[in-house]
Amino acid sequence: MRLPRTPSQTVGPFFEFGLVTKTELVESGAPGAVLIEGQVLDGAGDPVPDGLVEIWLADAEGRYEGNFGWGRCQTGPDGGYAFTSAKPGAVQEPDGTVQAPHVTVLCFARGLLKPVLTRLYFSDEADANAADPLFGAIGDEGERATLVATATGPATYRFDIRLQGDGQTVFFTTPASGL
């Protein structure tokens, strides 16, 4: 018996069995819980229904301990994703530098040979964002705005990831990972 091959793609196909997802880092309604939601959009502004979003974040005290702040979500037909987490606190580096509360976001999508890496900052942390060394290193105000999640309700933030085109989200490279 001969089985047909799956269609050729730039990357993939990806198989769901064995894929670990984790969208609730804390229970919905827990003290300090926030909902982070958004869409992954392509260059034309169309949803990416087969993407994958990973997040890493510190706990409410700004510490990275264990697997507290890790999540992974497949995008839905509308390109949407959502995580329930505690809002991260400011992170103090050993040299005394303070990073604003933020979420590190990794996005996998069709057509990308490598995932893209960005950061999500919170709109209600404007003073902390302004003092954050990475956020402040981005000279263009419009580009900085692509990194800010907008509060859309009580304990709810929206962060859309635009992969290219007008309003493209700012993406970063990291020398250690090669991303």
What are these regions (language model features)?
Residues 1-179:
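Beta-strand-dominated extracellular/periplasmic modules and repeats
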